[in-house]
Amino acid sequence: MKKVEILKTPVIQQRPVAPSRTSSPPVTAPRIAIKPRPPPASGNSGIPENNGPISPPDSSVSKSSGMKESVRFLNDIGEITDSISDLLTNSPNFNVISAIGPQGAGKSTILSMLAGNNSRQMYREYVFRPVSREANEQSRHQTTQIDIYVTNHQIFLDCQPMHSFSIMEGLPKLRGGRLDEATAMSDTLRLTAFLLFISHTVLVISETHFDKTIIDTIRTSEQIRPWLHQFRPKLSIERMTNLVFIKTKASSIDTAPSVIRERAQLLRLAFRDSKWLKISKEPFKCLLVLEEIRVKREHLYEGEDEIDETMLNEFDEHIAQLRVMLQRNRDDFTVETAAMDEKKWLEMCQEVIRDKTFHRILKEFHRSDRDRSSIYAENGDR
């Protein structure tokens, strides 16, 4: 019996063994130590899940949908991917932010930052994969049609580049047609008009302050609208889409306040008579100027390729301000406030794609554009 009691005593000593509970934390302790370590090292940015000073204190960029990267929203034939509905909820508190612009302007990078990435992460960690260095050198594009990334209350849409020769080369294979400028222009108008209708805010991202070709395309796309009079809840015909222009890869001259004010005034004049598009009249909210950051790649920072912490901190701060601004300025899609949720929004997108009026107006613009191209070609041959 005494031996049995003696055998029990070690067992009793093992029960309160606080060391055994404290001995398991050392296994997880390195993980806990690793997470807080990056924020001080990277200044104001932090790891993607800890947005710190870069994002508002709410969960506006929390990855509640479980998405690790963007997926295709529109497939090659221009229809919405079947699995998108699984990413959306019945919440009426959502914000749709799209990005359009020419090839290589940084659309995917800006959207990735708004979605929760930061300027110190590897490019392969971005939710919208930026164009690779090899593809950029060969003038190839990264995004085809439209990609989507969903976070808590935020829906980000990344559009293929506008007026891209790389896109135009692939159109005959997708559409079974021929390579011509009119077909490429029609494809650009279709996607731009679609995004202008279904988005709260459209970011126009370019390497120039005032890109007349892009602005003309937007003004034309504004007129290509669907007629969804039977859609419920009833849509507001007076709703205006918010436009924000972003100049990327800016030099020190581009960031001068006088230059920004002057170019912003030109943009306001270009859209002063717009019925469905609005531009902020507040200073420095119509046009945002961002300096170039180098996308971090493997084995990049060697020798002269040292990262500029000050530049990265300023870039992250601009993104933080933009993120807050995009939350405030949005009009309801419907006549009644908060009558549309995320899933209803997806139904509206599907109705736009199927709408006959939308495609009829698009065909008219396509026909007139092809006629103009034929006239120019004939005049050039003479």
Curated annotation (Swiss-Prot):
Record GO biological process: nuclear-transcribed mRNA catabolic process, nonsense-mediated decay
Listed InterPro entries: P-loop_NTPase, SMG9
Domain of life: Eukaryota
Tagged with keyword Cytoplasm: no
Region (Disordered): 1-66
Keywords (A to Z) from UniProt: Nonsense-mediated mRNA decay
Keyword Isomerase: no
Protein role: Involved in nonsense-mediated decay (NMD) of mRNAs containing premature stop codons. Probable component of kinase complex containing smg-1 and recruited to stalled ribosomes.
Assigned protein family: Belongs to the SMG9 family.
Protein name per its UniProtKB record: Nonsense-mediated mRNA decay factor SMG9
Organism: Caenorhabditis briggsae
Lineage: Eukaryota, Metazoa, Ecdysozoa, Nematoda, Chromadorea
Gene giving rise to this polypeptide: smg-9
